[in-house]
């Protein structure tokens, strides 16, 4: 790969979001184009099909917001399922909890994991060698369909934006299957897109989860390299869902190890739903 510094951009609806840097890896897998760059400001970053997935500088905005509201709010968290998550960041955050005994990480594209292990070592960290983590190169939808009833305490949907091979992860049918394999007091956590750049998808996810699950709540925060900068995560349960009061005696220790997440941050983020989204959900 030539040592050339240039602008690498993601294009969305007449807008572009770019980082200046050098391309370290450009590879086409069976599913998508994988691009790793070394950027001037955000460090190493991952693109899939020319969409930003993560960067060294801002990845904790995403991973900490996806994981900790869920795991801090449930008592039982021994069995965890991650759909996607090939950069290793979600697994890393989950493994901070001593109660976690087993994580199944189901990633459809093995090349994403290989690229992340080679170029984004700091994101996955020691998660890749933790014996509690088992990696499965498989289709997440099919994995969920085959899983036992009431098996997982927490399911994380850490996937890319809807595409030819990920569209089924955003359907009522898939959410119903996730509900089936969750324990009664378990929780589902999913990235739920941007209320600005991907408003229609965002609304669809929120409405689908409200339809399928008894309870669901959405929080908003920032992921600087994502289109518009504002992002969301939605949490759903078929039983209890108390996201304001932690059920975990490790919270204080975990807060100290986080760059972004703490309970005050979380509680404020759950109150940030834009009014235009409120009106659409109530229409």
Curated annotation (Swiss-Prot):
Chief localization: cytoplasm
Family from the record: Belongs to the spermidine/spermine synthase family.
InterPro entries membership: PABS, PABS_CS, SAM-dependent_MTases_sf, Spermi_synthase, Spermidine_synt_N, Spermidine_synt_N_sf
Catalytic activity: S-adenosyl 3-(methylsulfanyl)propylamine + putrescine = S-methyl-5'-thioadenosine + spermidine + H(+)
Protein's UniProt name: Polyamine aminopropyltransferase
Molecular function via GO: spermidine synthase activity
Gene3D superfamilies on file: Spermidine synthase, tetramerisation domain, Vaccinia Virus protein VP39
């Amino acid at each position: 790969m030539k040592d050339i510094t240039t602008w690498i951009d993601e294009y969305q609806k007449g807008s572009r979001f770019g980082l200046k840097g050098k391309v370290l890896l450009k590879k086409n897998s069976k599913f998508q184009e994988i691009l790793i760059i070394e950027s001037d400001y955000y460090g190493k970053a991952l693109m899939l099909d020319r969409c930003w997935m993560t960067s060294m500088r801002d990845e904790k905005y995403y991973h900490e917001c996806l994981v900790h509201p869920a795991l801090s709010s449930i008592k039982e968290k021994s069995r965890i399922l991650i759909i996607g998550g090939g950069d290793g960041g979600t697994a890393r955050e989950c493994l901070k909890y001593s109660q976690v005994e087993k994580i199944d990480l189901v990633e459809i594209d093995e090349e994403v994991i290989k690229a992340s292990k080679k170029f984004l070592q700091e994101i996955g960290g020691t998660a890749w060698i933790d014996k509690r983590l088992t990696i499965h190169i498989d289709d997440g939808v099919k994995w969920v369909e085959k899983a036992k009833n009431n098996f997982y305490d927490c399911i994380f949907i850490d996937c890319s934006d809807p595409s030819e091979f990920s569209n089924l992860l955003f359907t009522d049918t898939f959410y119903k299957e996730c509900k089936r394999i969750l324990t009664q007091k378990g929780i589902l956590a999913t990235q739920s897109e941007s209320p600005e750049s991907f408003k229609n998808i965002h609304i669809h996810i929120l409405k689908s989860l409200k339809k399928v699950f008894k309870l669901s709540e959405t929080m908003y925060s920032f992921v600087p390299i994502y289109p518009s900068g504002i992002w969301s995560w939605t949490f759903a349960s078929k039983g209890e869902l108390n996201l304001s009061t932690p059920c975990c005696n490790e919270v204080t220790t975990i807060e100290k190890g986080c760059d972004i997440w703490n309970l005050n941050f979380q509680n404020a983020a759950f109150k940030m739903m834009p009014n235009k989204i409120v009106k659409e959900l109530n229409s």
